[in-house]
Amino acid sequence: MTDDDHKQLKPRPQTIATADDGWFERLCAWADKFDISEAALPRDKAELLVLQKLVLFRKLFRKQFALLPAEIGQLGNLQELVLFWGDLTELPAEIGQLNNLQKLDLTGNQLNTLPATIGQLSNLQKLSLGDNQLVILPVAIGQLGNLQELDLWHNQLTVLPATIGLLGNLQVLNLRENKLTTLPAGIGQLGNLQKLSLGSNRLTTLPAEIGQLHNLQELILCEDQLTTLPVEIGQLGNLQKLYLLGHQLAALPNSIGQLSNLQSITIDSHLLLELIDMVPHLPKLKYLSLRNLTTLPTKIGQLSNLQKLDLSDNQLTALPDAIGQLSNLQKLDLSGNRLTTLPDTIGQLDNLQELDLSGNKLTTLPESMDQLRNLQIINLRDNMLGYILDILPNSIQRLYHKRNGALEIWLNDPVAER
């Protein structure tokens, strides 16, 4: 062999051997049948065998398909498979052959079951199955020992398999918008779970084992049918965000006061007074969002550590003078209420940087607002302001004022919208 012969030799890519040489032709025929572009699914065998990412969505194929071919299991180097907003009704058992798969996203299809072989995806880290028709999960789901994120929102699940508790590396679990009536006790075994979303199910109680989720940082419980919370909720020592909206809760357990790392809470208005009584035990609480409000109690002034207060989209017609006691408040959202005036004490909010008053019925603003020396952004859209005297501080950088009728603005030099 001459030196020239050596120069003509080219290294061949490493591929995965397969005993079935016909799989390539069948996979290409399937792709051609449904007009799947070559950019998405190459028609070159060598390229397919080293393919690491396969993304299929409506823009990449002209015809809808309900089934993935069994030959998809031959793509042994695949690390990411994304097929969302399609018409898939089932997965082939061969999906379990994708041993290197790390991400599987099947959001927005018509799946009602999963093959047991999905448990063979030992390297899977993220599984997204939201907006499907799943009524049950296979027991084998518990074999996904490396799974970190499991998204099951908007399905038809009524129960979870006990094996869900075997997902020891799971960090994010989204069960929102299903038909769950109970949770298995095994959920308490998810020791690395950081975020749990249970909103819009049919839960009336939570298992006491939920208190074992010592690494949980965010718990979302919105629009369920909860009547009580377990006292064990107070054991969630790392919880930072708690959402409690749209329930039939008559009271909060006193153990809420043990959540020493809680920074943010969103609750219905009828639970506010109880929460305020617990505030001395919640030193890190900085953000409060309230819903279904018609009045704001004077006790709100006791939340002196608050930095953000969201009172948007309620039915407030007035604010108590005590609002001015929130000396650390940086952002106040009062949009979408029925306010006609503001108390003079609003001028005492020395640290306020952002104020949203849009969508109210304000006809004037208190002169004390010129004392808000740190105010940078103010939204006055959709009110009934006839004019504003020169009372807004020079610190304002953004002023939104559209749809206020005959509004006249007397400002020194704001950066107002035009």
Task: Tell what function each PLM region has.
Residues 1-85, 89-93, 99-107, 112-128, ...:
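The feature captures the LRR N-terminal capping module
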